Amino acid sequence: MTSRRFAYVLSLAILLALPASAQAGGHVASATGVKQVKGKTLYVDVVVAVPAGETARHATDRALSEQGASRAKPPWAGGPGGGSGGGGGGGGGEQYFYNGLKWSPPTVTQNYNGANAPIAAQTALINTYSDWSNVTGSTYRISSGGTTTRCPSLVKECPGAQVNDARNDVGWAGLGGTTLGVTWFTPSSPEADMALNTLFTWKSTCGTSGGSAYDVETVFLHENGHVAGLDHANRTDSVMYPSYQAPRCTLFDYDRRSIANLY
């Protein structure tokens, strides 16, 4: 079997056959990496279940390495109201963070492949479209293109080379290590592909008790922030903060201001 197994990765990847300390549905961390593929720059966001006794930095560095990427901060991220979004930001020079993706027109159609999914997750994915699309002052919209049989083309675990196919697909893959999911994106030729790890235990209803299960809508909500063009935020009142220990089922006001500033 090829090393690029039938799998789907969009800046999210996890593994059930990992240390029990990483299966508690607890501390989750996220980081962005960069990879060169045939002269093209690809970025990937990894979402990782951090094992007990390990730092978030070490866990995310390992996950990035498994994706063939190295830690990188997009050069356009940061700055008061800045990044690729421009504009003046919020009151008092509030700082926003962007990853270089900016859609023109500001619309994204996302397709879902549920093959090998351990739970019914499409409804949770669609729920996040309402969050990111219905922000006062923002023209950004993301919607469902229905289902697909495609493996997201930018995902490392998919068959063949990592290439742009001008589609934004979401799927599932057997990702390694402690990765819950990945989102790969290319600002130069706007595209974003996502995959979650089939090997973890998930729950589909955000905010409900799930024991050791990880909340799939929380991961989709964070990753679709990256799809919209947002980078990790430096404040905890944001779904884009790169660490959390409890489900996040809706945007914070800061997230709404961030995307309204970009679009």
Regions found by a protein language model. Name each.
Residues V9-P19:
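Bacterial N-terminal signal peptides
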